[in-house]
Regions:
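N-terminal beta-strand motif that seeds the catalytic metal site of vicinal oxygen chelate
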Residues: 1-15, 68-72, 121
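Short amphipathic alpha-helices within nucleic acid-binding modules
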Residues: 19, 78-83
């Protein structure tokens, strides 16, 4: 069994795409509308794990997804921190280095979902 994707219901597709596609760097694998009310975007590599963004005009989503955190690995934590700051995204916590081989920080996505950015050495 393989993990395929995680689904995030978003309040603003444009803001979420800017965050996950432009800033985090996930590729748009697929994008389509479902009727007049919904839009779905699959982000990630063709054969890899994906992030599915779903926007529904009629759906009220909570201001924050409690107890959910998504992690992304980067080659340089310093560059990732600069990228966040240059895009006016506040560093919520960190950088943290519990052991010498790993360091990370946390930000929130546009809907308040906690996103961990990690560098493994």
């Amino acid at each position: 069994m393989n993990f395929c994707w995680i689904t995030l219901n978003v309040s603003d597709m444009e803001k979420s795409l800017k965050f996950y596609h432009e800033i985090i760097g996930l590729k748009i694998a697929e994008q389509f509308k479902v009727g007049e009310e919904s839009e779905i975007v699959m982000l990630g590599e063709k054969d890899g794990t994906k992030v599915e963004l779903i926007y529904n005009k009629k759906q009220n989503i909570p201001a924050r997804a409690e107890k959910l955190s998504i992690g992304f690995e980067v080659p340089s934590l310093d560059e990732a921190m600069s990228l966040m700051k240059n895009n006016d995204i506040s560093i919520k916590r960190g950088p943290i280095s519990p052991v010498p081989s790993i360091k990370f920080f946390f930000v929130d996505d546009p809907d308040g979902i906690e996103v961990q950015i990690v560098q493994n050495n």
